[in-house]
Amino acid sequence: MMGQNQTSISDFLLLGLPIQPEQQNLCYALFLAMYLTTLLGNLLIIVLIRLDSHLHTPVYLFLSNLSFSDLCFSSVTMPKLLQNMQNQDPSIPYADCLTQMYFFLYFSDLESFLLVAMAYDRYVAICFPMHYTAICFLLHYTAIMSPMLCLSVVALSWVLTTFHAMLHTLLMARLCFCADNVIPHFFCDMSALLKLACSDTRVNEWVIFIMGGLILVIPFLLILGSYARIVSSILKVPSSKGICKAFSTCGSHLSVVSLFYGTVIGLYLCPSANSSTLKDTVMAMMYTVVTPMLTPFIYSLRNRDMKGALERVICKRKNPFLL
């Protein structure tokens, strides 16, 4: 399909971030530090969950996949951004641009599905604590959040995102791009590419609206529904300590959900007529750079289970014979 594309350009030019030349080195160091923090933090989560058997539970299965998704999501855009800032070469080949767009959609969709799975896991843990305890510690196959169900949810998320990202990529590949090849963004954003196309983009726009509702809005509503049930269940708890514990358990997930869905829905599904390039860039930075970096801190590095796992792994390294 890409071979039939009638584009007359071989590459695009990414304008990058609106940064003054004298601020270039400082911003480069800042974004490099943020990217390395994202990589190391999410890798630490994945390794700890893999090595510590106490973390082989539904919530940490979803969290390890979310950390891997965040790691890859950030890696889709950040290396090219850092390279352009360092080399002052904003060009990106046409095929590479479509490839970047594909993986950007892939991992953003995957994050959306995994956030829903984690919300449902919190719902089961709080509203059905006896079932959840049996699942987590006795490994019984129950009708609620069984290990097979958890693995199926993760596998289905990976498969569905593949088809959705491929659909948008193939639709983009059929468009014609003429003289204008300047993308006012720091990555190959789908909406920015559509504005450069010199052929009819109505099919693309309808697919974005319809599939966006399925991939973003419906999962967001499912998350809100799960937390509505959670709040209703929490308010029935007579103990103030239990209420505080339940809210602290859900608060971290809700903060990431608000940051991710708020910016994505506002940027792609509810764009304003007077939306500026700077505003769109800042919003994109929030969910492509900031959210993946904050995930380890919000979810795990302040989590008692993760701290315990880190201590056990360190102790095993010091004393291999320690059980």
UniProtKB/Swiss-Prot annotation:
Subcellular location as annotated: Cell membrane
Cystine residue pairs: C97-C198
Membrane topology (Extracellular): 1-25, 80-100, 168-205, 270-281
Topology of the protein relative to the lipid bilayer: Multi-pass membrane protein
Major site of localization recorded for this protein: membrane
GO biological process: sensory perception of chemical stimulus; signal transduction
Database matches in InterPro entries: GPCR_Rhodpsn, GPCR_Rhodpsn_7TM, Olfact_rcpt
List of glycosylated residues: N5, N274
GO MF entries: G protein-coupled receptor activity; olfactory receptor activity; signaling receptor activity
Cytoplasmic compartment spans: 50-57, 121-148, 229-245, 302-323
Any single Gene Ontology cellular-component annotation: plasma membrane
Listed SUPFAM superfamilies: Family A G protein-coupled receptor-like
Pfam families: 7tm_4 (PF13853)
Cross-referenced PROSITE patterns: G_PROTEIN_RECEP_F1_1, G_PROTEIN_RECEP_F1_2
Keywords, alphabetical: Cell membrane, Disulfide bond, G-protein coupled receptor, Glycoprotein, Membrane, Olfaction, Receptor, Sensory transduction, Transducer, Transmembrane, Transmembrane helix
Chain segments annotated as transmembrane: 26-49, 58-79, 101-120, 149-167, 206-228, 246-269, 282-301
PANTHER family per the UniProt record, alphabetical: OLFACTORY RECEPTOR (PTHR48001)
Family to which the UniProt record says this protein belongs: Belongs to the G-protein coupled receptor 1 family.
Role: Odorant receptor.
Protein name in the entry: Olfactory receptor 1E2
Organism of derivation: Homo sapiens (Human)
UniProt lineage: Eukaryota, Metazoa, Chordata, Craniata, Vertebrata
Gene: OR1E2
